[in-house]
Amino acid sequence: MPSFDIVSEVDKQEVRNAIDQVNKEVGTRFDFKGSDARVEQADYTLTVFADDEFKLDQVFDILTTKLAKRNVDVRSLDKGQVEKISGNKVKQLVTVKTGVESELAKKIIRLIKDSKLKVQGSIQGETVRVSGAKRDTLQEAIQLVKKSVTDFPLQFQNFRD
């Protein structure tokens, strides 16, 4: 029975490379001269440091540009609150979302069932497995999910006959 998986993954190494590029660019740019602006990574949590909120926004813009150039979908970034740290320096936590959350998975399954396609969906951890009798109906299901879910980056993997 043909099937495929709907997942949401981010290449950790590409994120690391983008952060290295951001830190290098911030270190060489004239408008950041003498500032302590940088980005640090701990697993899928990024911390953006800067002297003030304006520079923090500039560093975040550089980060999103570098991630986009490295084919990392910026919709997977979740910005946290801006926190004041020592003096007038600020930091912001940015979480890189991976995996299909259960609420989104339920929405995808409901969408597939409501479409009356002859496919079945099941939640398996952080992935959604969709299986059906025909390959064409699975491809229709892929197109349906691509059109409907635009606010979260999804990939379609393990297409099997």
From Swiss-Prot:
Keyword Nucleotidyltransferase recorded: no
Top-level taxon of the source organism: Bacteria
GO-annotated molecular function: nucleotide binding
Keyword Zinc tagged: no
InterPro entries to which the protein is assigned, alphabetical: DUF520, UPF0234_N, YajQ-like_sf
Protein task: Nucleotide-binding protein.
Family to which this protein belongs: Belongs to the YajQ family.
Protein name: Nucleotide-binding protein Nmul_A1044
